[in-house]
Amino acid sequence: MNLVLMGLPGAGKGTQAQLIVKDFDIPHISTGDIFRAAIKNQTPMGVEAKKFIDKGELVPDEVTNGIVQERLAQDDTKDGFMLDGFPRNLAQADALNAMLVDSDRQLDAVINIHVRPEVLVERLSGRFICRNCGTTYHRLYNPTKVEGTCDVCGGHDFYQRDDDKPETVKNRLDVNIKLNTPLIDFYKKQGVLYTIDGEQDIDKVYQAVKEVLTNL
């Protein structure tokens, strides 16, 4: 079973990935992890990628594609894999199709965990931190027991990281939506896209994912 897992930041993709790996026993291939491994192991593509990263430049598609291809050539992917964070654009999607054709494989499903942007902004911008002891809270999921007072140290001074501020979160989501929309259309046309409602409880989301994968 060969999968691609898609979802905007905050959609709960990481949690679903762990559950899929546990039940279906396929490797979770996250681009961040394979980049680090390729650079550490000094693979040909890892060496190329490091040149760009060291200069603070974006790694070109052909190098990213090469790193994914190196990983998909490893033995543990022969019975299936789950890609997470790749492809990020249509050029990478075409490259993935070519890789799979070359190795006599095909993509079985693209699972898209869908959560409305306004819900994601709420999820991602709800985090706040006690300035005194550093304990992290969330306005919706993990608030302080007494409003305005830290459970751990009793402090009253909280702050929000710049990354977690609603405007920053919204901008980050906008960038991701622009990247994801053409990919969603691409995979819809190929007939392999399955969109899952990510606004349900984690268990219900996974139930829907599992149903799709079991019936492939």
Swiss-Prot record:
Listed PROSITE patterns: ADENYLATE_KINASE
Keyword Plastid: no
Protein species of origin: Limosilactobacillus fermentum (strain NBRC 3956 / LMG 18251) (Lactobacillus fermentum)
Subunit organization: Monomer.
Assigned protein family: Belongs to the adenylate kinase family.
Subcellular location: Cytoplasm
Chain positions covered by the region annotation NMP: 30-59
Any single Pfam family the record assigns to this protein: ADK_lid
Gene3D superfamilies to which the protein is assigned, alphabetical: P-loop containing nucleotide triphosphate hydrolases
GO cellular component: cytoplasm
Chief subcellular location: cytoplasm
Domain comment quoted from the record: Consists of three domains, a large central CORE domain and two small peripheral domains, NMPbind and LID, which undergo movements during catalysis. The LID domain closes over the site of phosphoryl transfer upon ATP binding. Assembling and dissambling the active center during each catalytic cycle provides an effective means to prevent ATP hydrolysis. Some bacteria have evolved a zinc-coordinating structure that stabilizes the LID domain.
Amino-acid positions noted as binding Zn(2+) in the UniProt annotation, renumbered to this chain: C130, C133, C150, C153
Cross-referenced CDD domains: ADK (cd01428)
Region LID, residue ranges: 126-164
Name this polypeptide is given: Adenylate kinase
EC number(s) given by UniProt: 2.7.4.3
Residues the entry annotates as binding AMP: T31, R36, E57, L58, V59, G85, F86, P87, R88, Q92, R161, R172
GO molecular function: adenylate kinase activity; ATP binding; zinc ion binding
